Amino acid sequence: IWGPYDGWAKDGTGDTGFTMAHSMTPSLANPYLFIYKGAELPRKNSIKDKDGNAHPGGLNFKVGPQSAGCYTFGSTADAIRGSYDGCLDIAESDYNQKQTVVGGQSHNRYAFFSVPVGVNYIELDIKELTVFFDKR
């Protein structure tokens, strides 16, 4: 999990924005499914979209603990590298509902999910290209 949601924290395992406390674990039953189950995710910083609107708790998913050139699973929000970030707002009413992710190394690296207060469970399916957020 990467992004400003945790205040761009760093614990020495990779680039700014990565911490082992918020890393995802591959499922033993399905190698395409990654799970985060732990403490409630913080919402320290926001993503600003092309209109200047702030979206707290912005995050996306990267393969590996580096941000530059890393394969990323981002939201479907409009984003252009070097111009503006995009953010898809997730509400509590969206808990346990699948959202589409976009995989690649292009503009999707700057497309985030803004998660609500209380999220402590995430399932990312990199085969089906879906993610869902929950509070458990």
Which residue stretches match the model-derived regions?
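Aromatic-rich carbohydrate-binding modules that target alpha-glucans
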Residues: 1-56, 66-92
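Exposed beta-strand face motif in extracellular beta-rich ectodomains
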Residues: 57-59, 120
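Extracellular recognition modules
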Residues: 62-64
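Structured interaction patches on ligand/partner-binding surfaces of diverse proteins
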Residues: 70-130
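Eukaryotic intrinsically disordered, low-complexity regions enriched in proline/serine/threonine/glycine
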Residues: 131-136
